[in-house]
UniProtKB/Swiss-Prot annotation:
Enzyme Commission number(s) from the entry: 2.3.2.27
Alphabetically ordered keywords of this record: Coiled coil, Developmental protein, Metal-binding, Transferase, Ubl conjugation pathway, Zinc, Zinc-finger
Subunit structure: Interacts with USP5.
Pathway in which this enzyme or protein is active: Protein modification; protein ubiquitination
Name of the protein in question: Probable E3 ubiquitin-protein ligase TRIML1
Keyword Zinc-finger: yes
Organism the protein comes from: Homo sapiens
Entry-linked CDD domains: SPRY_PRY_C-I_1
GO biological process, one term: protein ubiquitination
């Protein structure tokens, strides 16, 4: 077997079935066949069928293959060896490039001529018949490969043109599905909106009924009190009481009136639960940490700067301008001058707490009320079984049926929007009127005073990344 045949056999063994070239980063599939990594992945990508071996078409359990580094090294060596052999043949064929034509003529006379000099006397020569045939075969082989590759490219082009139409049809179908589903969602949300509005209207009617009934009751009580006052004043101004029984009667009639303490009616509104609000808000989740430089000296912060509680004893901390000296307050490290931001705070079973947003320039010294526009906060207050929420500033209260355990804070800086949400049931607690922010804003937190040991739990900033 000639060297050329050996080289050809070696090339066939080290050639990828797909690209018909020497292996490049070869991998071996479950069935034992090897391919270039890029070729195999491209083949699987182009054929939208169950994964199979491109050579034997055996169905594979999955995209499993092993790297075959040794085969890659052999292919690299064979490529270099082939190049050297071809170069050697060219050098042998160029033996006729000699200073004189005598050697070429002598070899030609012996019938073993490898070269024939050109008639113009130049040094350019012809290859021997054997070398010429070898190169002709190689050219034909390359030509055949090029034709195969062109045929493959034409097939892929035809397939891609079909995929263009298919892609357009699939996109059109998906758009129709999206429009249809969002129409259903819009209808669902519209119905939810109507239900919430009806619920609020019913609660408004009930609250108005309570207020009117209490108004009538108080009016009657005032009339009775006025009548009794007039009777007693009239009796006391006379020179002498007509009888002891008259005095006793007046006292007996006044006793029930004295026992009736005027009371204001408690009105309640359900927190507005908005479907899908939690998912929408959490798209704007912002990592919030506490700023130790602003914390009141009585406050204790956790190591991760996510939790704060009232410590009970004053810590030895510098009285820097940023620190709150009277209010049990700490600011968040983050400073906002743009964008939308949302975070949640676990308030747990605390009986008093305050969370919200304030201007970065808010006063840190003293304990005076903050001017309107400097502070946007939500205050939770529990006294006995009575639980209420207050917003500041200006201060405005609202009774709620159940305590809020987790508060969501939302800021849209550009639109001037700040709102508080119940982080447990997605309901809206309060939305401030639209404002125009002209300076930086920061989160603000206050665990408030311990209240004789009933309010010692911490405020904890929740991590939302794992829930999104």
């Amino acid at each position: 077997m000639s060297t050329a045949d050996l080289m050809e056999n070696l090339r066939e063994e080290l050639t990828c079935f797909i690209c018909l070239d020497y292996f490049s980063s070869p991998v071996t599939t479950e069935c034992g066949h090897s391919f270039c990594l890029v070729c195999l992945l491209r083949s699987w990508e182009e054929h939208n069928t169950p994964l199979s071996c491109p050579e034997c078409w055996r169905t594979l359990e999955g995209p499993h293959f092993q790297s075959n580094e040794r085969l890659g090294r052999l292919a690299s060596i064979a490529r270099q060896l082939r190049s050297q052999v071809l170069q050697s043949e060219d050098e042998q064929g160029s033996y006729g490039r000699m200073p004189t034509t005598a050697k070429a003529l002598s070899d030609d006379e012996q019938g073993g001529s490898a070269f024939v000099a050109q008639s113009h006397g130049a040094n350019r020569v012809h290859l021997s018949s054997e070398a010429e045939e070898h190169h002709r075969e190689k050219l034909q082989e390359i030509l055949n490969l090029l034709r195969v590759r062109r045929k493959e490219a034409q097939a892929v082009l035809t397939h891609e043109k079909e995929r263009v139409k298919l892609c357009q049809e699939e996109t059109k179908t998906c758009k129709q599905v999206v429009v249809s589903e969002y129409m259903k969602m819009h209808q669902f949300l519209k119905e939810e909106e109507q239900l919430q509005l009806q619920l609020l209207e019913q609660e408004e009617k009930e609250n108005m009924r309570k207020l009117r009934n209490n108004e009538i009751k108080l009016t009657q009580q005032i009339r009775s009190l006025s009548k009794m006052i007039a009777q007693i004043e009239s009796s006391s101004q006379s020179s002498a009481f007509e009888s002891l029984e008259e005095v006793r009667g007046a006292l007996e009639r006044s006793e029930p009136l004295l026992l009736q303490c005027p009371e204001a009616t408690t009105t309640e509104l359900s927190l507005c639960r908005i479907t899908g609000m939690k998912e929408m808000l959490r798209k704007f989740s912002t990592e919030i940490t506490l700023d130790p430089a602003t914390a009141n000296a009585y406050l204790v912060l956790s190591e991760d700067l996510k939790s704060v509680k009232y410590g009970g004893s004053r810590q030895q901390l510098p009285d820097n301008p940023e620190r709150f000296d009277q209010s049990a307050t700490v600011l968040g490290t983050q400073i906002f001058t743009s964008g939308r931001h949302y975070w949640e705070v676990e308030v747990g079973n605390k009986t008093e707490w305050e969370v919200g947003i304030c201007k970065d320039s808010v006063s840190r010294k003293g304990n005076l009320p903050k001017p309107p526009g400097d502070l946007f906060s939500l205050i939770g207050l529990k006294i006995g079984d009575d639980y209420s929420l207050w917003v500041s500033s200006p201060l405005k209260g609202q009774h709620v049926r159940e305590p809020v355990c987790k508060v969501g804070v939302f800021l849209d800086y550009e639109s001037g929007h700040i709102a508080f949400y119940n982080g447990t049931d997605e309901s809206l607690i309060y939305s401030f009127p639209q404002a125009s922010f002209q300076e930086a804003l920061r989160p603000i937190f206050s665990p408030c005073l311990p209240n004789e040991g009933t309010n010692t739990d911490p405020l904890t900033i929740c991590s939302l990344n794992s829930h999104v």
